[in-house]
Each structure stands twice: as C-alpha cells, then as structure tokens.
C-alpha cells in the first residue's frame, strides 16, 4: 500500500538520522494500535548495545493520534541508552552475545520487567508529533485504558554498514519498487534489484519475538 509512503520522507526525521547515524538506511517498520485493556509490554531495549559512545539504530515514533496517559503511552527511562541492554528481542540480537554484567549493572536490573521502573517517564504528545530515541533506550508500551485510537508508526533506521531488522529486498514487490523514486530505493536498500551483497542478521532459532 502507498498509504504510508509519506512517512519515508519526513524531513526532520531524515535530518536527525543523518546527524546521529551518518550514512543510514531503513532498519524496520511496524504499526501499533492496541485494543482497550491491552498494549502492555515488558521493559526492553530494541537492540543490543554494540558501541558504547555511538548510535547505531534510531527509533522514530510517528503519532497519528494524540498519545495520552489514558490510551497506552510509551514509557521510557531517560539516560538508559547508556546502560546495558535488557530483554532484547531475539530477532534483533544478530551476532551479539551478552557478557556477564558488572555489579553496577546487576544493581540496575529490575526484578520485575513488567513493573514501573524508578525514574521512568510516560510520553505524551499531539497527533503529528514524532518522538526520536536511541534504540538502546529502555522502554515499553503500556496498557490502553481508554477506548480511543493510539495509532503510531514505528520506524527504525540504522547505519548503512549494518544489517536491517527486516531485509527489505526479500519482501520487495514490483508495484512497490516501481512507485519508489531513486532516493526511496536507496533508503530502503532495494536498489539495485539484487539481494547479492546485502548484509543480513545472523539467524537464530526462536519461537516468538522475544524467545
């Protein structure tokens, strides 16, 4: 569908990606609108921490509706992108293998991944806003208590020398390719129409998103 093509060319998002990542490409994309009573997630980071002083994946949360305290706002722990990764989805682990945490890191780890974390914030913003974070930030969805939409598009971007979460060229259709201009094809890494040489995530056995 072409319905979300405009999300690929939000100038401030692309400028932020270039400023924080350098040469970049699309990493992944999904849409989220939990039903009332649902939407809670365990606290997690989307990617492992591969570079202590460097961004390597960026999250852009594009709000199609107001995000309020009642409709399941995203919770974040400010500054946690400098900490150790936590509860990373298997699909994003790649070649990373966790090391034994230090005593300081162990002290940070929550005993309950579902419980509120000290210092966490609930993000609220108006429709049309975009929230940009480091993908190593500790965060999660929360329960939607109101029966109103909270539609968001999650876009992630990564450096061009690193693999995508979803290798876009593997799912490429001719209508999609034909309607993309040269800049969009470069952004999605679908140009040329050849999967040879595309860097890919290491395959891991898993039964679901997190395990």
What positions do the PLM features span?
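Double-stranded beta-helix
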Residues: 69-140
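Short, surface-exposed loop/helix-turn segments at secondary-structure junctions
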Residues: 43-46, 94, 103-117, 147-149, ...
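Short, conserved beta-strand element in jelly-roll/cupin
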Residues: 51-69, 124-127, 132, 156-160
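Non-heme Fe(II)/2-oxoglutarate
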Residues: 130, 137-211
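Non-heme Fe(II)-dependent double-stranded beta-helix
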Residues: 1-52
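A short beta-loop-beta micro-motif enriched in histidine and acidic residues
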Residues: 46-57, 118-119, 125, 148-149
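Short, solvent-exposed loop/turn segments at secondary-structure junctions
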Residues: 31-36, 67-69, 81-82, 136-139, ...
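Short, structured patches in soluble enzyme cores that scaffold and shape functional sites
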Residues: 30, 45-47, 62-66, 78
């Amino acid at each position: 569908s072409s319905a979300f093509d405009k999300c690929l060319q939000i100038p401030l998002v692309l400028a932020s990606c270039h400023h924080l990542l350098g040469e970049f490409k699309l990493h992944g994309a999904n849409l989220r609108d939990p039903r009332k009573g649902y939407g809670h997630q365990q606290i997690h980071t989307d990617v492992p921490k591969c570079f202590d002083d460097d961004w390597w994946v960026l999250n852009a949360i594009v709000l199609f509706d107001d995000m309020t305290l009642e409709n399941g706002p995203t919770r974040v722990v400010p500054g946690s992108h400098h900490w150790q990764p936590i509860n990373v989805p298997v699909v994003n682990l790649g070649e990373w293998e966790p090391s034994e945490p230090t005593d300081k890191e162990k002290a940070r780890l929550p005993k309950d991944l579902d419980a509120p974390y000290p210092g966490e914030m609930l993000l609220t913003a108006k429709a049309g806003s975009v929230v940009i974070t480091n993908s190593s930030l500790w965060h999660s969805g929360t329960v939607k208590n109101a029966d109103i939409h909270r539609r968001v598009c999650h876009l992630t971007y990564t450096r061009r020398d690193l693999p995508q979460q979803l290798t876009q060229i593997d799912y490429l259709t001719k209508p999609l390719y034909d309607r993309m201009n040269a800049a969009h094809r470069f952004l999605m890494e679908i140009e040329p129409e050849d999967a040879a040489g595309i860097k890919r995530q290491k395959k891991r056995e898993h039964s679901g998103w997190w395990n």
